[in-house]
Amino acid sequence: MLMFLSSFYGIIDSKNRVAIPSSFRSTIKNSKEKTFIFKSLKYECLEVHLSSKINSLVKSFDEKDFFSKKNDHFKTAILSDLEEITIDKEGRFIVKEKLQKFSKISKEIIFIGKGNHFEILEKKLGDNHKKISRAKFK
């Protein structure tokens, strides 16, 4: 199973590009899947998922009550902002301004591996998120 593990710091350059950490790039390349980004529903961050996870998510939406407003809101919240990312030869992709505003990222960022996906957060928010998460298990 391919997984996104560990945490890495990075920056957004003047052209709004971020370089994906090499181990994450390797996971994406080895998966041979498309890669998608969207606004997290849990935190002020961006989530990056492979197409297999997105397909699984869409399938789960389709298996739920079609007329459920809750299901419809969930689909809208995720799928209306979902975007495929294009990774260049240097392993970078562009983070659109609307995603930067939502996640409060500007220059320094952190990539946090979550197994089947990874999150991109503003560095200080990400460091704090990791600290809070660890404290929950003491």
Summary of predicted features, one role per range:
Residues M1-G10, S14-R17, S23-I85, K89-E90, ...:
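Flexible "stalk/tail and boundary" regions
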